[in-house]
Regions:
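Domain-level signal for soluble alpha/beta catalytic cores
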Residues: 1-170
Length: 170
């Protein structure tokens, strides 16, 4: 794999890519605390990553990712994989006030569908309340293994694993 080109501009994307309905249903059940067959869940995630990577390659995307297939969303990702954050369900999500004010019609629809009814997990603000430590070693290992396996059967210039930006939390 090469990570640059002098012939053309390489393409990639950021953010989640659509997940299959069966994966969404399993994620919603997991977030709700319903009992799950862990092997079935992991197999569905592995298949979703493989399909997501295949579609990116077929579309002509050069720099591939797992499309965040294993993550219900980065709002829950922080609580699942980092220590030092606490949920504040009584607080309103601050969001991006300047951008929201600049594009109110878009964000009205976005918050209603993507962040509300369309979200896998309820959006609950989290606040840093202590030292930050990583605790998601097994989950990130699984994500990397799934991505490596998926990429092994397609042509890609490069690959990356998405993660939340530090600015995504307070």
């Amino acid at each position: 794999m090469q990570d640059r080109s002098t012939q053309r501009i390489l393409t990639t994307h950021v953010g989640s890519l659509p997940r299959p309905k069966d994966v969404l249903d399993l994620m919603k059940a997991k977030v709700a605390g319903a009992p799950l067959d862990a092997k079935v869940y992991e197999a569905q995630i592995r298949c979703a990553v493989a399909e997501c990577v295949r579609k990116q390659a077929e579309t002509g995307i050069d720099i591939l990712s797992d499309g965040e297939q294993s993550k219900p969303g980065f709002f829950t990702y922080v609580r699942e994989r980092l220590e030092g954050f606490e949920p504040r369900p009584q607080q309103r999500m601050q969001g991006w006030p300047l951008e929201v004010n600049a594009f109110p019609e878009y964000y009205e629809q976005y918050f209603k569908e993507a962040m509300g009814g369309g979200a896998i997990a309820p959006v609950v603000p989290v606040v840093c309340t202590g030292p930050i430590r990583y605790r998601g070693g097994e989950a990130v290992k699984r994500d990397l293994e799934n991505l490596k396996a998926a990429v092994s059967s397609v042509k890609a210039h490069a690959v990356f694993m998405p993660s939340i930006a530090p600015s995504g939390e307070e």
